[in-house]
Every structure is written in structure tokens, then in C-alpha cells.
Amino acid sequence: MLEPEFWVAVAFVIFCGIVWKAGGFDQIINGLDRRGERVRRELEEARRLREEAAALLADYQKRRGEAEREAEAIVANARAEAERAAAEGHARLNDFVARRTKAAEAKIAQAEAQAAAEVRAAAAEAAVRVSETILREKVTGDAAQDLIRRSLGDIRTRLRA
């Protein structure tokens, strides 16, 4: 009975009795309860934060998807607008070339007509001079001179028309 283990056990039982009598176990239990309550609140806070983070992530992903779709729509619209502008520019260029070609053809036709008229006029003038020269050599007298003048005037009018 005088063994040290025995006295350690007796001292422990007496200590536990004193602690129990002083309300130490209640304090330990209350402390553990408070700690458990604090842990439970922290877990609830963590759960709430996790749900909030999940909601924010979902919102972010939704907005990112919307932004990507909007960007794709903007790019598609820009591409369509560029193609339309290119087609419009091409059409304007073709129209410009067609108008210039038509104007050039009209100028060429006018120049051809003017050249043909000048050639006819020159040919008529040459024919009148040749006719006048021939008639003056062949026909003589006042009546002949009057006839030559009338004939040459008539020839000039007909050749110029």
C-alpha cells in the first residue's frame, strides 16, 4: 500500500474531487461547448462563403459567356460591314470605270464624226476647186461664169450635207 502509484492515484482522485467541487468540470465543459459553438459558427461562415464564392463564380462564368458571345457578334458585324464596304467600293469602282469608258467612247465617236465631217468638207472643197478649174478651162463667157457659180454653190451644198 505504500507504493508510489497508489499515492499518485489517491492524489489524482482527491484533485478531481476538488476540481469537481470548485466547478472546474463545468468550466471545462462550458469551455468545450463554447469552442464547439465557435467551430460550428466558423463552419457555417465557411459554408456561406463557399456558397457565395460559387454564386460569384457562376455569375462570372455567365458574364464571360455573354461577353464572348457579344464579342463574336461584334466581330461578325464588323466582318459583314467590311465585306459590304468592299463590295460597295468595288461596285463604285466598276461604275466609275464604266462611266469613264462610256465618256471615252463618246469622245472617240465625236472625234470620228468630226474627222469624217472634216474629211467630207475637205473632199467637197477639193472637188469644188477641181470642178471650178475644169469648168473655167472648158466654158467661157458671162453666161458660163454665172452657170459655174451656181453649179459650184449647188455642189458645195450637196457635198457638205
UniProtKB/Swiss-Prot annotation:
Q: Which Pfam families match?
A: ATP-synt_B
Gene Ontology molecular functions? proton-transporting ATP synthase activity, rotational mechanism; proton-transporting ATPase activity, rotational mechanism
Entry keyword Metal-binding: no
Can you tell which superkingdom this protein's organism belongs to?
Bacteria
**Which species does the entry assign this protein to?**
Methylobacterium sp. (strain 4-46)
- What InterPro entries would the database entry show? ATP_synth_b/b'su_bac/chlpt (IPR002146), ATP_synthase_B_chain (IPR050059)
Where is this chain's protein located in or outside the cell?
Cell inner membrane
- Report quaternary structure and partners: F-type ATPases have 2 components, F(1) - the catalytic core - and F(0) - the membrane proton channel. F(1) has five subunits: alpha(3), beta(3), gamma(1), delta(1), epsilon(1). F(0) has three main subunits: a(1), b(2) and c(10-14). The alpha and beta chains form an alternating ring which encloses part of the gamma chain. F(1) is attached to F(0) by a central stalk formed by the gamma and epsilon chains, while a peripheral stalk is formed by the delta and b chains.
Please provide, in alphabetical order, the Gene Ontology terms of the cellular component aspect for this entry. plasma membrane; proton-transporting ATP synthase complex
Gene name per UniProt: atpF1
Q: Would the keyword Transport be found if you checked this record's keyword annotation?
A: yes
Q: Which family does it belong to?
A: Belongs to the ATPase B chain family.
Q: Can you say what this protein is called? A: ATP synthase subunit b 1
Q: What transmembrane ranges does the database entry give?
A: 5-25
What is the recorded membrane topology of this protein?
A: Single-pass membrane protein
**Function per UniProt:** F(1)F(0) ATP synthase produces ATP from ADP in the presence of a proton or sodium gradient. F-type ATPases consist of two structural domains, F(1) containing the extramembraneous catalytic core and F(0) containing the membrane proton channel, linked together by a central stalk and a peripheral stalk. During catalysis, ATP synthesis in the catalytic domain of F(1) is coupled via a rotary mechanism of the central stalk subunits to proton translocation. Component of the F(0) channel, it forms part of the peripheral stalk, linking F(1) to F(0).
Alphabetically list the UniProt keywords.
Answer: ATP synthesis, Cell inner membrane, Cell membrane, CF(0), Hydrogen ion transport, Ion transport, Membrane, Transmembrane, Transmembrane helix, Transport
User: Sorted alphabetically, which CDD domains does this protein's record hold?
Assistant: ATP-synt_Fo_b
